[in-house]
Amino acid sequence: MKGNSKLGSPPWMTAEGMVDLTKLPIDFILKQAIDPEYKEFRSACVLLGSMASVGRLEAGLYLLGLLGWYASDLQRLEVIAEQLAHSPHGSSANALLAEIRRVRSSNTTRRYLDRVLRSLAVLPPHLVESGLEALAEDTSFSPKMRAKFFATVAR
């Protein structure tokens, strides 16, 4: 019995049997990204980040929306910030820079803010330099945080 061989491959499968992220349907991933189970959420965000890295603007846009949806969940925000590094768009840079201003540094938030800075460090310099320089010159941040902003600009 040949099963579904007459039906052919789905349009998002390549001839080599690989998934073409530029054609993969996104609906099920969007639902998974708001799943209460952390493992499901994380898997969806990683896939959205991969899709954004191959030019799927809608995947990056959804990640931006998740920043607001999970605004008080640092564990999930860390995953979202990590994946936004794969969305080289001005909106991603602006959202990550805004997170640094929104979330005050403390022992509880330090890990998340460090993740935001690591994501900013891999985005194209022309998207982040002026924002990071402005943060580095802002005396409302501690000298330690300002040094981190300068170090990120220098990368």
Features from the language model and the residues they span:
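Structural detector for internal amphipathic alpha-helices that build alpha-solenoid repeat scaffolds
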Residues: 2-21, 31-54, 65, 75-89, ...
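Amphipathic alpha-helical scaffolding segments comprising HEAT/armadillo-like alpha-solenoid repeats
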Residues: 19-32, 53-68, 89-103, 125-137
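Structural signature of alpha-solenoid helical repeat scaffolds
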Residues: 36, 68-72, 104-108, 137, ...
